Each structure stands twice: as structure tokens, then as C-alpha cells.
Amino acid sequence: MWPMLWAFLISSEGSPSIIYLFLFLIGVVLTRSAGCVINDYFDRDLDAQVERTKDRMLVSGQVTTYEAIILFVGLIALSILLLMLIGLDILVYALAAFCLLVIYPISKRYIKIPQLVLGIAFGSSIPMVYIVETGETSLSCLLIYLATISWAIAYDTYYAIADKKDDIKIGNKSSAILFGEKDTIYPFYFHILTLVILVAVGVINNLGIIFYFSLALALLVSTYQKILVSNRLPYQCISAFENNNIFGLIIFFGLLLSYLYAVSYTHLTLPTSRAVE
């Protein structure tokens, strides 16, 4: 959700369309929910072999596979209706996003770093935001997308560390397995890469010091996460994963306050400029 909100603020220069913003927020809830359902559907046999996930509703029988499919189809149908309200200009990106929802859980069986697929899926709303706000994509759009992918690899690796031993046993693939003994270090590097890319976004869009200060705070948060997972205790890895909401929130407020300051500064200096004229 946070990268989508970043994209709205940057593409609109701090004045996003409230209607589109509201529709996209609903869309994120629907598609993420659909993603969780289809992920649990494909992973149900594997989840039964993992200590942390063996009690999930599909595994325990609280929900049948038929009910899961019906729920998934219903969520996708609502997403399509929402797409029609937003506009068909983003149809290609939306279709790609729907495909990625299905591909991601399957990718964990075949791709060594499925978190890359996850990042591409989670960032798919960014070009859609740019199209509805500006009518086109741009370099900033691409950079925010790349930052989102890098960030997804970072935080989902923490999540994957929690299940690493079980994933190795059952043959699942993950970035945590790929990174080996450096599985607690590489996520921090990807956090740094994310922030470096966002610095470039800030330069391109002439963002103020408040934004860069928020990136510095986000770096402190990512440092805390690195320390948190150092012992690889599953509950601490999950906490580090969840803590990334703070990372995204800080950057969002950095953008928001940066644009609010720019607007207030313009209003304060405008009368003086007119007086000189």
C-alpha cells in the first residue's frame, strides 16, 4: 500500500485525486485479499508441513478449497468492477497484476528468489497511479517501481527466515535460502538500495529536506530490523517483517510534509513577490 501512496503524492505533486486515491485503496484491499486466498490455496499442502502455518484455515479444514476458490473469484470480480470505475487505460497493467497474483505462490516452487515476483506484483499499482494522474508513465514511476521491488525483497526475506528450516525440508524456494548465512544481512542491503533509489526520485522531483530526513529515519528503522533478526528467532523475524509498515509510513509522511511545506512556503512568499512588483 505504501508505495502506491508514495506514487500518488509524487505523480500529483502533493495534490492527488481523492476519488482515484479512494478507489485505489479499495483496490489494494481487494487484490491483496485475493492474493492471500490464492496463496493459501496453492500452499495448503506445503503449509501442513510447516509449524507456523499448519493451523491455517484451509489446512485445518475450517474452509474448503471450493469456498476458497469462490472467495477468490468474488474478490477478483469486485476488482474488475472497480477497474471499470477507474478506467480502461490501466487495463493491461491490471491484467498483468492479476496474473502475478496467481504466479507468485507457484513461483515459490521453481524460482530461487520468489520475492522478486512478489515485488513486481506489489508494485504493479504504481504505473496505474501514474496513468490516472498524469496520463503516462515516467522515469520517476520506474524508479518508484524498482524501489518497491527492492523493498519487497528486503522485508519478505525477513518473513522467509522464519520458515527457512521448514522450507528447506519441503523444497520451497526463498531469498532466505538463496542468501544462505547472509540471510540477515542482504535484506539490509536491499533496504539501502531502496533508499538510494528514493533519493534519486527526490532529486528528479525537487523534493525538500523533509523528504530526505524521512529517508534517514527509515534507514534507522531498517537498521533496527537488521539487529532484530540477528538471532534468527522466528517471532523476531516476523516482527521485523511487520515493522516495515513503519518504514513505509515514515517515507509517506516525509513526502506529505515536504509537499505541505512547499505549498505553505509559496503562500507565505507570494504576497512579498507581488509587493515588489
Give residue ranges: language-model regions.
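Core segments of transmembrane alpha-helices
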Residues: 1-4, 73-76, 118-126, 187-198, ...
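Conserved small/polar residues in nucleotide/adenosyl-binding loops
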Residues: 265-272
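Intramembrane alpha-helical segments
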Residues: 26-28, 33-34, 56-139, 143, ...
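Extended hydrophobic alpha-helices typical of membrane-associated regions
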Residues: 196, 200-264
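Helix-coil boundary and interhelical linker segments in multi-pass alpha-helical membrane proteins
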Residues: 7-23, 80-92, 127-144, 199-211, ...
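Alpha-helical transmembrane segments of multipass membrane proteins
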Residues: 31, 35, 79, 151, ...
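Multi-pass membrane catalytic core of lipid/isoprenoid biosynthesis enzymes
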Residues: 23-28, 44-94, 169-209
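Membrane-embedded alpha-helices of multi-pass transport/permease systems
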Residues: 34-38, 42, 89, 153-172
